Amino acid sequence: MVYLATDKQTYADLSITETANNEQFLFSLFSKTETKEGKALMLNWIMYPLSDLGEIRKRQEAIVWDALPELLLNEEELDFIEYYLAYRDQIREAHILLSCATVIDRLVRYDSTRYVICRGVKLVVHLLHCLKEWATELPQGAPQLMKESAAMIDNILHGSELEEVLEQTSDEEKRLSNFVIDKFDYLFRCTRLLSLKELLSVIYLLDVCRTPHRVAKEKSFCCIPVMVQTMHFSVEGFVHT
């Protein structure tokens, strides 16, 4: 990525994130994303503009695309996944004897940590299935940015332990055993944590594209202005004293 050099004074002059007179600033137009991480990514796009015309066009084409999907998970589910992945308690490799030995204890005693792990595992499994389905069914005419995201999903899943998770959970309604939950938990929170972070970034990218698309529709904004390499510009009847 090649970024445009900017400074604090430029941000202030353009009223990017704040104004001197409590007026509406630019970011407020596009800050109503559906997720917290999407909002952070949107701010990053605005605060660090690109100077590469090709990359700018990719973003524009993705934003204007009328087939942008609904977010694959809702905000609460995504927040819980983020919380679960950041949760550091009881990270250990799965052992079938330990999993079996703790079954009765888990049935008779409520364990908040176990709740986080069980729900987190189920939501991550659901996330993997949603992303796999989206990447597989992406139409040929999709914008390049969406194709790149789908390719990233395929590269991460193909031939990895995460692909094995998809195969083992083809029926998402099927109850997972304690041992399988423990095995998946170690995989998600330790072995393939960074891969899951990359996969989550696709959801936030969709959020960032959907938000200006929605704003542009509501306010009749132009999504893709005509951009040229060179132009002739002249001013007449202007006097400077």
Question: Where are the language model's segments positioned?
Answer:
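Long amphipathic alpha-helical segments
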Residues: 134-141, 197, 215-224
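Residue-level detector of functional hotspots within protein domains
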Residues: 25, 185, 219
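Extended alpha-helical scaffold/assembly modules in large eukaryotic proteins
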Residues: 174-178, 182
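Conserved amphipathic alpha-helical "coupling/scaffold" segments
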Residues: 1-175, 202-213
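Conserved NTPase motor "head" modules and their coupling/switch loops across ABC/AAA+ ATPases, GTPases
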Residues: 204-241
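Generic detector of short, locally flexible boundary/turn motifs and exposed helical patches
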Residues: 7-9, 198-201, 227-231
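Phosphate-/polyanion-interacting regions in eukaryotic proteins
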Residues: 181-204
